[in-house]
Amino acid sequence: SLMALMLWSVAHSWRFPHFFPTRFSLTNWSTPLQQLLEPLSVSALAALLSCLLAIILVVGCFENEQNLARARIASISQRSLWIIYLPLLIPQISFLFGIQVVLVVFHLEGTWPALVWVHLVFVLPYVFLTLANAYRSYDQRYSYVGMTLCGGPLRTFFRIKLIMLAKPILFSMAVGFGVSIAQYLPTLYVGAGRFATITTETVSIASGSDRRVMAVYALTQLLLALTGFLTAIVLPAAVFRKRKAMQN
């Protein structure tokens, strides 16, 4: 299917029964690119904001979990994890209408805070799942040595722990970024049709008859989602280029 999208995006004419397009052209990309600037910017901004909020909440959750474990205080986090996973288990359409009604009552429908919040509902579980193993496997002895050498727990957290966990954090954010990009129904319901994202535009174009334009929109959506993963790969390699162990 990916190969078909790539061929359609550069096809000038492709008629039955030809196996490949008879003519190729890049004109399919020239016109839609101007129309894609707003959907791309809206999608990227909403995804970045929801990912940043998600990573802050998830890191705070794990830190609280570890603090309770060190203090040997009984935690209900394991028993309440199902709350985080609910958006993954329940069909979106079954509770999005309720969220929309609440936002309408409080006059928040079609606003940026509402859009970011509803994306956060779906981004948070994926960020939590992808970061859980790496964060819980972190060797606390690094932090103990850091507190001995360079100062208090807050300074050690930012200068040692977060740096050592930078790559898994970036990858979990990349997953969340891709999840946010893919949201269609939440954007349509909560955004009240006021936010044109790359996904809503792609679905709208897909209902038309021009497969060439549809392929351009679909590939653009794919490339935007891949940007997050490329950043998660390239950024640690560039920042820690003199520290080979930090790149793995």
For each of these PLM feature ranges, what is it?
Residues S1-R15, S30-R136, M164, P168-L185, ...:
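Membrane-water interface segments at the C-terminal ends of transmembrane alpha-helices
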Residues F20-P32:
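Luminal/periplasmic active-site loops of membrane-embedded glycosylation enzymes
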Residues P17-T22, Y184-R212, K244-N248:
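Glycine-rich helix-loop "coupling/hinge" segments at transmembrane-helix boundaries
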Residues S94, R155-T156, T197:
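Residues in the helix-turn-helix
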Residues W112, Y142, G151-P153, Y184, ...:
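Membrane-helix interface/capping residues of multi-pass secondary transporters
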Residues L68-R72, Y138-A166:
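Short helix-to-coil transition segments within interhelical loops
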